Amino acid sequence: MNATKFLVLLVIGVLCAIVTARQVKDLSTETKLGASLPKTTTKGIGAQLSATGSTFSSSSVVSYANGFNNPKGPGANAFESGSTFTSGQVTAKGRKARVSSASASTATGEAAAAVTRKAAAARAKGKVASASRVKGSSEKKKKDRKGKKD
């Protein structure tokens, strides 16, 4: 490559760089972030007041008992299984937002089987209980004596 070609390519590169480098306009913070704050907000804090909560509770129990008498003799079997599941979610925004969530569940079961030489007996019972509670509150800004907001 000779010096003339190099100089021409260098000038073209500089011109392209100048053309593509435009002055960036000053944008508002709202435009840059892609979000807009309502005019009613005070410094953007405490504008949205909300308190939400959810909770879920589930219980299950399986009790099984079997007694039988066949030609080979009496027999019995029993099975018991219980399971519980609880979950909760809490979201609080704004000034003095409070949320409490609680859930509880229990599962109990009983299974029994008895066998004698001439007879078989079986018994099964199960009990489940679930409870859930959610409380939430949020306070708005109060006006002071002069009529100004906090």
UniProtKB/Swiss-Prot annotation:
Keywords: Signal. Residues 1-21 form the signal peptide. One of its GO terms (cellular component) is apoplast. The keyword Amino-acid biosynthesis does not apply. GO terms for biological process: mucilage biosynthetic process; seed coat development. Disulfide bonds: none annotated. Residues 119-135 have a biased composition (Low complexity). Residues 119-150 are annotated as: Disordered. Belongs to the UPF0540 family. This is UPF0540 protein At1g62080. It comes from Arabidopsis thaliana.
